[in-house]
Regions:
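Short, well-ordered alpha-helices that flank and scaffold nucleotide-derived cofactor binding pockets
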Residues: 22, 45, 120-123, 153, ...
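C-terminal helical cap(s) of enzyme catalytic domains, especially alpha/beta-barrels
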Residues: 41-43, 133-159
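Internal alpha/beta core interface subdomains
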Residues: 116, 122, 127-136
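Alpha-helix termini
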Residues: 107, 124-125, 148
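Conserved anion-binding
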Residues: 1-109, 113-117
Length: 159
């Protein structure tokens, strides 16, 4: 029920992770690169921080890849497949890919979520948690308080 501090990283080395944790003190490190499952387990233990692994769902085979993170990441973040840059691309994926998924660990939904579609996404997928970035921006990189408020209201009213 609270907003938590999340830092998005892509294939970070240990020195960068140490600097991030020391400076920002995030609640969560969200990994959007090609990090190995074991690396997330080590990072979580070493820095005493939650680790989330973003999985781009372009097709059902990505769910097989996701299963390799069970017991290593604290949560999976199902997102649209990366375009040019990982994370925050503003594109939804085919939520039907989650219909038959036996995820077996905590997960969250991301990818193209906005105030006008997040309630439907939650109802369609049963997502226990949602993640947003560009869906609450008035311009690239500029968060809009009215959009954030509308997004949070839509999430609260989705259930």
């Amino acid at each position: 029920d609270a907003v938590r501090t999340v830092v998005l990283v892509v294939d970070p080395d240990e020195a960068l992770l140490a600097a991030i944790v020391d400076t920002v003190r995030p609640d969560i490190l969200q990994f959007h690169g090609s990090e190995a499952p074991e690396a997330l387990a080590v990072t979580g233990a070493q820095f005493d921080v939650e680790t989330w692994k973003a999985i781009g769902l372009g097709d059902a085979s990505a769910l097989d890849r996701a299963s390799t993170y069970k017991g290593c990441a604290d949560r999976l973040l199902f997102d649209a497949p990366p375009a040019l840059l990982p994370g925050g691309n503003g594109e939804p994926f085919d939520w039907a890919l989650l219909d038959r998924a036996d995820i077996g660990m905590p997960w969250a939904l991301a990818g193209g979520l906005r105030p006008d579609n997040v309630a439907g996404a939650i109802r369609r997928t049963g997502a226990p948690l949602v993640d947003v970035s560009s869906g609450v921006e008035s311009a690239p990189g500029v968060k809009d308080i009215a959009l954030i408020r509308a997004f949070c209201d839509a999430v609260r009213n989705a259930r």
